[in-house]
Amino acid sequence: YGWPATSFGINYSGARITPLTSAEGITPPVTYWTPSIAPSHLLIYQGALFEAWQGSFLVSTLVDQDVKRLTLNDNSVTDSESLFSELGARIRGVHEGPDGAIYLLTDSDPGSVIEVRPKTVDSANEP
């Protein structure tokens, strides 16, 4: 895909990795973040628990400390939202369980695995 020959990124020093953002024969990214969100994992959600998210790309991030949910259509991002930022933790991984539950792996100290399920009417009324 071109990195590091082409890039929208910058080094830790602030200098551009390369002045080129495109070149012949290199497929450009569908999306990118500048400054970097430090994406750490990508999942295409296929589960049934979060039906509205089926086919969405879930991108865990270290810098933004969230999961980006991206909706793609015809190879372009048509919608994006930030999820789980209230955790206040760097999210290293996002995984889907066999029943469609989502598992987040944080690398904060101490690291943890967080299971995410839809809130049910019954659990909303529990103390």
Tell what function each PLM region has:
Residues Y1-E81, A89, D99, G111-S112, ...:
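Beta-propeller domain segments
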